[in-house]
Amino acid sequence: MKIIVASSNKGKIKEIKKFFEGIEILPYSELIEPFEIEENGTTFKDNAIIKAKTIYEKLPGSIVLADDSGISVPVLGGVPGIYSARFAGAGASDKDNLYKLIDELKKRNIKKTYAYYTAAIALATPYGIFTTHGFMHGNVIDEARGNKGFGYDPMFIPKGFDKTLGELDENIKKSISHRSKALELANILLKSINN
């Protein structure tokens, strides 16, 4: 089996490859010229479906996996939410987005507050489109700690831990992450449709 990932995000692709060991995982950009996919949905699920469908239309008959994920901070009105990848503006780096969120907390004198990650996975297959979700709850802090992971990991402390995802061992992160939970369900779906 081969899975085409509808992303160019190296961090996401690396995480997906680790999860689906023994299955060929290819970013779509290795098969077709990369292009910008307009994510104009109002939820993580909407955007994951848009990405999966868009790549599937270019590579019909394949299995396309798309992820849309982000972090939501309720005390800030749920931001960055679906705008997590572009919170600091179009073309912003992970680091830019991270420090923008830290600045938003500091502006309000918030040292630590509840937040959660959401991951929506869409699978576009010859049998239709399937979706799964995963969540990870915890707190964000007003500083970056650790250099593991990517995105907002250095400021997010998962529930039950005292270290940020940027400080935790990658195997621990893999076992508790929102994306891992959604990918686990996606893996079950894939096995059921491939039998």
From Swiss-Prot:
Taxonomic source organism: Nautilia profundicola (strain ATCC BAA-1463 / DSM 18972 / AmH)
Superkingdom of the source species: Bacteria
Biological processes annotated in GO: nucleotide metabolic process; purine nucleoside triphosphate catabolic process
SUPFAM superfamilies for this protein: ITPase-like
E.C. designation(s): 3.6.1.66
Task performed by this protein: Pyrophosphatase that catalyzes the hydrolysis of nucleoside triphosphates to their monophosphate derivatives, with a high preference for the non-canonical purine nucleotides XTP (xanthosine triphosphate), dITP (deoxyinosine triphosphate) and ITP. Seems to function as a house-cleaning enzyme that removes non-canonical purine nucleotides from the nucleotide pool, thus preventing their incorporation into DNA/RNA and avoiding chromosomal lesions.
Subunit structure: Homodimer.
Active site location: 68 (proton acceptor)
Residue numbers binding Mg(2+): 38, 68
GO MF entry, a single one: ribonucleoside triphosphate phosphatase activity
CDD domains, per the entry: HAM1
Name of the featured protein: dITP/XTP pyrophosphatase
Co-factor note (free text): Binds 1 Mg(2+) ion per subunit.
GO CC annotation terms, alphabetical: cytosol
Cofactors, names only: Mg(2+)
Record's keyword terms, sorted: Hydrolase, Magnesium, Metal-binding, Nucleotide metabolism, Nucleotide-binding
Family annotation (Gene3D superfamilies): 3.90.950.10
Family according to the record: Belongs to the HAM1 NTPase family.
Pfam families in the cross-refs: Ham1p_like (PF01725)
Binding site for substrate: 7-12, 69, 150-153, 173, 178-179
